[in-house]
């Protein structure tokens, strides 16, 4: 008996959908990040927007801007990525926490741009990302818990390997002879895998 239970719950293949009220402007009028541009989305039915058909690639270890617009100020925002694909959102999956759009403001259009970083060891592949807002209070730790005013929206992200090259790899690059004698050069590098090289002359021509 009693009401004790897990902090998160899910059904097969579905995340929980807390019912929130965004009818007077709370929540998200738009969310833009990566290749996703969900502008003028308005208030979702029952305060939950399933936009998982919209997807973008995000790279391990990289930092991204997310631009958000609301129709009512003092929106506290949290975001999770379901890295283990269990349809629950847990504390170790939070990528954006307690960002406030239009702090201290009331009705009207308010925008904000936050940043979030993908962990360097994030699981590759497709995952859900959830953005949740709550008016004048932090988003509950339990992502299934409803607040009076706010909205929840879900999208899909595809985690890919970072394409960056470290400074150490660059320092280990060796090209000889220098100056070039004839048409042949030797390039030594600690970078494994395929390499792409462009050669320019002193005037900047390829």
Segments from the language model and where they lie:
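A broad "non-catalytic interaction surface" signal
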Residues: 1-162
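C-terminal outer-membrane/trafficking sorting elements
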Residues: 166-206
